[in-house]
């Protein structure tokens, strides 16, 4: 199935406010509520919509530190290392990348002690050769809501 202009408009509205009801979306797009229901169901079935969530301000929840961590790992262990790291509650993103490092991790911490424990735990994972941690001084933009 293909995603058309109406699907993209629905997605744009949901990206802005995932609490919108089918009725509100239908009214904004001037289409039937049933159409909106069917389209959203189709987008879920296709895996385009993977859930509905809220956008949080992590600093207001006490997560003062954002770390970007480059990890050099043994090639045959990369996938296993990524899975182990992805399970940690501090981790928001794990990327398998090209370049100097094999893995890039974005994680949020409430304290330097939490970050220190995390980095040391990463270094103890079998196959991790080295890490390089950068702490964000200011978050200028942090928004994964791209226009569909």
From Swiss-Prot:
Span of domain HTH asnC-type: 3-64
Q: Which GO terms describe its biological process?
A: response to amino acid
Q: Which domain of life is it from?
A: Archaea
- What GO molecular function terms would the record report? sequence-specific DNA binding
Query: Keyword DNA-binding on this protein?
Result: yes
What the entry lists under SUPFAM superfamilies is as follows: Dimeric alpha+beta barrel, Winged helix' DNA-binding domain
Looking at the UniProt record for this protein, which Gene Ontology cellular component terms does it annotate, in alphabetical order? cytosol
Any idea which UniProt keywords this protein has? DNA-binding, Transcription, Transcription regulation
Positions in coiled-coil regions: none
| Known DNA-binding region | 22-41
Kindly give the Pfam families that the UniProt entry links to this protein: AsnC_trans_reg, HTH_24
- InterPro entries, alphabetically? ArsR-like_HTH (IPR011991), AsnC-type_HTH_dom (IPR000485), Dimeric_a/b-barrel (IPR011008), Tscrpt_reg_AsnC-like (IPR019888), Tscrpt_reg_AsnC/Lrp_C (IPR019887), WH-like_DNA-bd_sf (IPR036388), WH_DNA-bd_sf (IPR036390)
Instruction: Give the protein's recorded name.
Output: Uncharacterized HTH-type transcriptional regulator PF1734
Q: Which organism is it from?
A: Pyrococcus furiosus (strain ATCC 43587 / DSM 3638 / JCM 8422 / Vc1)
């Amino acid at each position: 199935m293909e995603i058309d202009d109406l699907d993209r408009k629905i997605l744009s509205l949901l990206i802005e406010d995932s609490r919108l009801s089918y009725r509100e979306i239908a009214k904004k797009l001037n289409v039937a509520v049933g159409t909106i229901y069917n389209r959203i169901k189709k987008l879920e079935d296709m895996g385009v919509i993977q859930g509905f969530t809220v956008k949080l301000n992590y600093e207001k929840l006490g997560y003062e530190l954002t770390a970007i961590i480059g990890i050099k790992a043994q090639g045959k262990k990369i996938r296993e290392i990524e899975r182990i790291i992805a399970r940690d509650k501090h981790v928001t993103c794990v990327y398998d990348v090209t370049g100097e490092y094999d893995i890039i991790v974005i994680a949020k911490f409430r304290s330097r002690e939490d970050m220190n424990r995390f980095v040391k735990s990463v270094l103890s994972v079998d196959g991790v050769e080295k890490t390089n941690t950068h702490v964000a001084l200011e978050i200028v933009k942090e928004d994964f809501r791209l226009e569909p």
